[in-house]
Amino acid sequence: MALTVFEHASALWYRLQGSVSLAVLSTLAVVIAGWYILSSISLYFSRRQFIALHGCKPIANRYPSKWFGINFILEAGRTYKERRYLDALTWNFRNIGYTHEVRALGGTSVWTVEPENIKAVLTSKFKDYSLGNRPAVMGPLLGRGVFVTDGEEWSHSRALLRPNFAKDQVADLSMIERHLQQLLKMIPDDGKAIDLNDLILSFTMDSSTEFLFGESTETLTSGINRQFSDAFAYSLHDISSGLRLGPWYKFRRTDPKAVQSHRICREYADKYVEKALEYRRNYIKSVEDGATDKPSIDGGDSRRTFLRELALATDDREKLRDELLSLLLAGRDTTASLIGSLLFSLAKKPECWEKVRSEIEETLHGDLPSYEQLRNFKYAKYCVNEALRLYPPVPNNAKIAIRDTVLPRGGGPEGRDPIIVPKDAPVIYTVYALHRRYDLFGDDADDFRPERWENQRYTWEFLPFNGGPRICLGQQYALVETLYVLVRFAQHFSKIESMDPEPWTESLALTVSSGNGVKVKLERGSSDVHGLSTQGVLIDYGGLFAPTQKVPGTGVTQISKGKA
């Protein structure tokens, strides 16, 4: 059948349209390819200029990647499951190089335990790095808190929180003692073996929530707030899993239990934020009315808690909640990790336990410790430092370069020259391996030996709480709470014996802890302290682990000996 004029025209139009579409697509492909080639050439020459300007040399050491680096990923997964991931990283640094490059799936990362490199990342080149995927992974729980923000937003959070760690606001020692007493009650009197791990976590949860919220979860006693405690633990588990996936975290399936846990935690914090804002409103009203008494809520509660002090600085509900949960993460897990590792180590070293007990008894004679006495316990502090060295609570950290930048070590034949870190490349520094370098800490760097701290001071070789502008705000809180627990345990128990025949094994999440728990047998001494009268006493944390001058006019109240 003959085609009509209309059908001829339609066929011609479709042929022309197809030709035009093909021409457009071809042109677009050529433009994109040309742009990519020109961009690559431009990047090549600009990086050559950058390398020459900074004297960078090719990196000296590389991980032996195979199958596009899949062997590295498989090895990391295998050693993590075997609970020896950190030891495997330490082996890499000792045998490949203290700074080396890893190539996997088309990406390049730099791994380092060189103090000068870590110092550069955390100080002089601080603005060249971001947190990578941390905000996206941790955001569902922590929102826009201090641990998940960069730049001006982070600076604002830091400035908001810093005043609340002033010396006279850090902790009420009677509060720590009260929760410690609940912990001691959970330890059997008959000398039976016990795993202290969960008890320590409950203790730090209870003390941290009272310090931050103004009200404890009391998980060691009533367990009324166990839902929040369990939800918080599961939220941290979910975050840890997401961070381990790195850039592939986006492809994991949503965990409904994690979503529910995040919601429970945020709603729990919201209740206390609202109370703090009510305190703020009453405070402003009392100032306007010229009142001299502290404002109160709930029928007369006028305590000055951490959250209330924070609420006096801002009335942003989300900000208060996000910062509160961020600090709880640090206060609960970091301190629990340190206390657990310390007691695990001392249980394996009875001679060290005896030295701690002797030092404390010679000083206290059955009294509760004063702040000045805590400052002067040399051997006890050596033990705390040694636990931090061997088992830093946060053993691994990473930053992502947001522009081409430089590390001062790792290039050239000897690895002593600068190297370039390209934009978007991760830099991973492993504090766990840094603290076990034989050239820095001796041939016995893998051993628990507190005496190494007698005549030795370290700077960027010892980083249990990070360094630079992002150094942990609450490090003195964690250190003093740990030291106080050690002193009180030494007063309470004459012996601590390890019931775990195996060496320390890692359990790696956001923090690291003993994978087999803290299984010990404790023998109570003939006497404890002469009394527990620490009511209403404040402790000054400033300078506990480093000599400092007391600043006049700070309002710091020293604690006195607590006798009955």
Swiss-Prot record:
Heme binds at C472. Gene3D superfamilies: Cytochrome P450. Its cofactor is heme. It is found in: Membrane. Pathway: Mycotoxin biosynthesis. It is a single-pass membrane protein. One of its GO terms (molecular function) is iron ion binding. GO terms for cellular component: membrane. Pfam families: p450. It is an enzyme of class 1 (oxidoreductase). InterPro entries: Cyt_P450, Cyt_P450_CS, Cyt_P450_E_CYP52_ascomycetes, Cyt_P450_E_CYP52_fungi, Cyt_P450_E_grp-II, Cyt_P450_sf. Its EC number is 1.-.-.-. The chain crosses the membrane at residues 18-38. SUPFAM superfamilies: Cytochrome P450. Keywords: Heme, Iron, Membrane, Metal-binding, Monooxygenase, Oxidoreductase, Transmembrane, Transmembrane helix. Coiled coil: none annotated. Belongs to the cytochrome P450 family. Cytochrome P450 monooxygenase; part of the gene cluster that mediates the biosynthesis of fusaridione A, a bright yellow trans-fused decalin-containing tetramic acid with antimicrobial activity. The PKS module of fsdS catalyzes the formation of the polyketide unit which is then conjugated to L-tyrosine by the condensation domain of the fsdS NRPS module. Activity of the Dieckmann cyclase domain (RED) results in release of the intermediate fusaridione A. The unstable pyrrolidinedione ring of fusaridione A is opened through a reverse-Dieckmann reaction to afford its ring-opened form. PANTHER family: P450, PUTATIVE (EUROFUNG)-RELATED. This is Cytochrome P450 monooxygenase fsdH. It comes from Fusarium heterosporum. The gene is fsdH.
